[in-house]
Amino acid sequence: MFEIRKATLDDLSIIRSLADIVFPHTYREILSPEQLDYMMDWMYSDENLRRQMIAEGHLYYIAYKEGEPVGYVSIQPEGEHTFHLQKIYVLPSCQGCHIGKRLFEKAIQVIKEIHPGPCQMRLNVNRNNKAVTFYERLGMKKVAQGDFPIGNGYYMNDYIMGLDI
């Protein structure tokens, strides 16, 4: 059985435990161990996850396969007609099983529920991440690129991709 459920503050440890596996797996060949550690704390400490959900309006959804958490997606309203797909990750053992696509589709569904009119979903993705082709297959287009400082002398070297909804 497969389901996607909206996360609450009670689910922070689930998100963090998934991130502890998927984030290093995704970026181990792209980022230094030091930058990985910095970014894990910056994005996934309990304090920062709580801030994202309460103060910044992130909506997290967790995918479950046979009752076990296997991935998550986070979207955030960003302006009047734009939403940012902040995070979408699936456990390595479940990649290739269409869970990422289903999480992506869930993000679009939620955005349409919040904003029934035309809008855009954007995301940042590391230029060296194989996920670029995943997003392109789902209809996203590169709209910009940049090197964005995130603190401690680190940068995110990203494409910004967009999809009209």
Predicted regions and their residues:
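Flexible, glycine- and charge-enriched loops at secondary-structure boundaries
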Residues: W42, C97, Y154
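C-terminal "cap" of GNAT-fold acetyltransferases
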Residues: G117-V132, E136-I165
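Acetyl-CoA-dependent GNAT
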Residues: F2, K6-L12, S17-K87, L91-S93, ...
